[in-house]
């Protein structure tokens, strides 16, 4: 809840629910950030279905008014273009942006010291420090990373 805010330059506003903006590029290279309503309790399969529906409707030009509600964070995924790491910019009134890089297979050591292939992905979180301090952002990014490690492949 302490991160679920927007900032218009003058006023910090708390928002209800857990809306997450998704950066979606259209074929004309216009980027929209429609919002999916997610919670930590939302089953992963349902979240995937909501996200696919929202992205499809955005690219088809069928965004609805309820898709454009305020969100505290937007997710920008350039990993789908093979980009390993990047830093997206926070777009007001949002106060955070999560940059998602490509999943890569790299050599790593398992618990017994054997070399194994491991999937890694770079996440970068930008935050507006007028609203979210660095410790809050780091804790939030750590929680996202832990959640993603539990997601079924």
Regions found by a protein language model. Name each.
Residues 1-153:
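C-terminal catalytic/motor cores of large multi-domain enzyme assemblies
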């Amino acid at each position: 809840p302490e991160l679920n805010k927007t900032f218009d330059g003058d006023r910090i506003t708390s928002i209800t629910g857990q809306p997450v903006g998704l950066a979606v590029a259209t074929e004309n290279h216009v980027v929209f950030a429609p919002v999916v309503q997610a919670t930590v309790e939302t089953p992963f399969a349902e979240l995937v279905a909501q996200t696919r529906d929202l992205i499809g409707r955005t690219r088809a030009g069928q965004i609805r008014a309820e898709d454009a509600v305020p969100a505290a964070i937007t997710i920008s995924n350039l990993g789908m273009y093979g980009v390993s790491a990047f830093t997206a910019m926070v777009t007001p009134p949002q106060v955070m942006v999560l940059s998602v890089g490509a999943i890569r297979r790299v050599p790593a050591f398992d618990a017994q010291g054997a070399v194994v292939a491991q999937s890694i992905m770079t996440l970068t979180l930008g935050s507006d420090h007028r609203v979210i301090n660095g410790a809050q952002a780091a804790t939030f990014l750590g929680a996202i990373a832990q959640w993603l490690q539990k997601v079924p492949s």
